[in-house]
Amino acid sequence: MNLSSNDQPSQGRIKAKDWSTDLCECWMDINSCCLTCWCPCVAFGRIAEVVDRGSTSCGVSGAMYMIIFMLTGYGGSSLYSCFYRTKLRAQYNLKERPCCDCCVHFCCEPCALCQEYRQLQHNRDLDLVIGWHGNMERHARLAASTPSAPPLQAPMSRLV
């Protein structure tokens, strides 16, 4: 087994985790597969909104992706989206697999977007359709509705 430098934890760093699914396992979630193949700007916009933690909207990111694609072709949009893959990996401590992020996006943009979408949706319990802010509200509602354990009482003692 040949370990690259990305697999070995450095001092004080936690070892990077594997992706939940492989790059070419698009069939694992047919809905995200269809979305990334037929509407990559929408898939990218949703990914970017979550990776940016709501600082950019799905619409703005998706429009930027489409404009870059229309002006530069496949290469420009792949370059733009590969930076978000790098950001996503850093946030969730994921391995750089199967090769460097830009190569993954240049060689197979739809598969890369689909893998990122699956990672966020299924392994981070995020609904990419409702965006970052919608997910934060949903998680806050769930936390508020979860009953907490009653406080522990001191044991009873007898007065003699």
Swiss-Prot record:
Residues spanning the membrane: 62-84
Superkingdom to which the source organism belongs: Eukaryota
Keyword Secreted: no
Membrane topology: Single-pass membrane protein
Compartments it resides in: Membrane
Alphabetical list of InterPro entries matching this protein: PLAC_motif_containing
Biological process according to GO: pollen sperm cell differentiation
Main subcellular location of this protein, as a coarse class: membrane
UniProt keywords, alphabetically: Membrane, Transmembrane, Transmembrane helix
A Gene Ontology cellular-component term: membrane
NCBIfam families found in the cross-reference section: A_thal_Cys_rich
Family of the protein in this entry: Belongs to the cornifelin family.
Protein name in the entry: Protein PLANT CADMIUM RESISTANCE 11
Organism expressing this protein natively: Arabidopsis thaliana (Mouse-ear cress)
Source organism phylogeny: Eukaryota, Viridiplantae, Streptophyta, Embryophyta, Tracheophyta
Gene name of the record: PCR11
